């Protein structure tokens, strides 16, 4: 239970009309302690919430306002930024100056240096002028099951991407223990169309993506370097890996399959399962499935839970890790609120769904 005063748990959602913002509003509408007191937007400024999303209840029919830092600071203690890459950086420094604690859902502060971000987000770096390298160094990478202590005291948490979340959760325990080789790591991941956001895009049209599955950004996907950065930090040695995402014709859900070679070929699947269980025993947001049971994305849909499974191929000494999440919940908004819970002193799972509706 939190030591926080309920009066200091006011939350601003900036970018409320995108998929991330909609999920945040939906989840916080049932939260026992946080209260949404400010909605910020650009295109939707001036509209009442019920005009934007009549299908999501709100205790107060707030009007969406321009994201003015002074206005936000007057109405909120925390800010959840669900903005396009680059845009968060234009608002964050001013909010930090006003003692607003931030969870940023974009990639703006996931890298430990501004230079790294500019190397990956080239287009955005030419559009938005940034001089906040110190904030990049100070920001906490928000995988709650791994960085709880830093998140608790952080003023700026960078929420991981959906692909990094699903890929790193099963992989990091083995890198941390030095149980897998650093070379030859392969991640094959598949995600639904909502991962592309709410803005219209040709390749996300029903007639384009229905009844089809396709890889994209086979080389140089932006999440590759994000995964590599965290894998390197955990293992203590530089890591380069192969990451290939695929678009599948479903709305939500993400499946990641990670291939790694075991240093000790004598390890069994049960041995490896014990490794995962040891790391996540105290976390209800991660569930380890029995050996031989492999999760479906539908099992995690609408939840803030990651389902992990594994197998060992004794023929080649390879460890196969399988992870599924809801890309909009555990891969985005739910994880953001999980971080927010920690920052406010609440339990990880407070106000978050952990059981799916099936089918």
From Swiss-Prot:
Catalytic activity: N-acetyl-L-glutamate 5-semialdehyde + phosphate + NADP(+) = N-acetyl-L-glutamyl 5-phosphate + NADPH + H(+)
Pathway: Amino-acid biosynthesis; L-arginine biosynthesis; N(2)-acetyl-L-ornithine from L-glutamate: step 3/4
Chief location: cytoplasm
Active site: 162
Biological processes per GO annotation: L-arginine biosynthetic process
Source domain of life: Bacteria
GO MF annotation terms: N-acetyl-gamma-glutamyl-phosphate reductase activity; NAD binding; NADP+ binding
Enzyme Commission number: 1.2.1.38
GO cellular component: cytoplasm
Location in or out of the cell: Cytoplasm
Keywords annotated in UniProt: Amino-acid biosynthesis, Arginine biosynthesis, Cytoplasm, NADP, Oxidoreductase
Its job: Catalyzes the NADPH-dependent reduction of N-acetyl-5-glutamyl phosphate to yield N-acetyl-L-glutamate 5-semialdehyde.
Protein family per UniProt: Belongs to the NAGSA dehydrogenase family. Type 1 subfamily.
NCBIfam families, alphabetized: argC (TIGR01850)
Protein name: N-acetyl-gamma-glutamyl-phosphate reductase
């Amino acid at each position: 239970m939190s030591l926080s005063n309920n009066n200091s748990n006011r939350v601003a959602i900036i970018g409320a009309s995108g998929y991330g913002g909609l999920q945040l509003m939906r989840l916080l509408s049932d939260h026992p302690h946080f209260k949404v007191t400010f909605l910020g937007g650009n295109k939707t400024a001036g509209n009442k919430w019920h005009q934007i999303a009549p299908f999501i209840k709100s205790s107060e029919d707030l009007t969406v306002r321009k994201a003015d830092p002074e206005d936000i600071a007057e109405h909120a203690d925390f800010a959840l930024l669900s903005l396009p890459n680059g845009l968060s950086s234009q608002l964050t420094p001013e909010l930090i100056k006003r003692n607003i604690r931030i969870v940023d859902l974009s990639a703006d502060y996931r890298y430990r240096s501004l230079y790294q971000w500019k190397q990956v987000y080239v287009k955005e770096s030419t559009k938005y002028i940034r001089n906040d390298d110190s904030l990049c160094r100070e920001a906490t990478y928000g995988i709650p099951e791994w960085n709880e202590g830093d998140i608790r005291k952080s003023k700026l948490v960078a929420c991981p991407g959906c692909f990094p979340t699903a890929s790193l959760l099963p992989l990091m325990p083995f890198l941390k223990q030095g149980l897998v080789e650093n070379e030859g790591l392969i991640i094959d991941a598949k995600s639904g169309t909502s991962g592309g956001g709410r803005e219209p895009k040709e390749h996300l049209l029903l007639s384009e993506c229905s009844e089809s599955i396709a890889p994209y950004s086979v080389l140089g996907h932006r999440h590759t370097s994000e995964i590599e950065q965290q894998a390197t930090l955990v293992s203590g040695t530089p890591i380069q890996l192969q990451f290939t995402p695929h678009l599948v014709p479903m709305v939500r859900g993400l499946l990641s399959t990670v291939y790694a070679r075991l240093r000790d070929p004598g390890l069994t699947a049960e041995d490896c399962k014990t490794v995962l269980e040891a790391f996540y025993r105290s976390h209800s947001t991660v569930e380890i499935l029995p050996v031989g049971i492999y999760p479906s994305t539908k099992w995690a849909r609408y939840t803030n839970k990651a389902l992990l499974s594994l197998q060992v191929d004794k023929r080649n000494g390879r460890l196969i890790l399988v992870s599924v999440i809801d890309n909009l919940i555990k891969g985005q908004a739910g994880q953001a609120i999980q971080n927010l819970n920690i920052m406010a002193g609440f339990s990880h799972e407070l106000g978050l769904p952990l059981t799916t509706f099936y089918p």
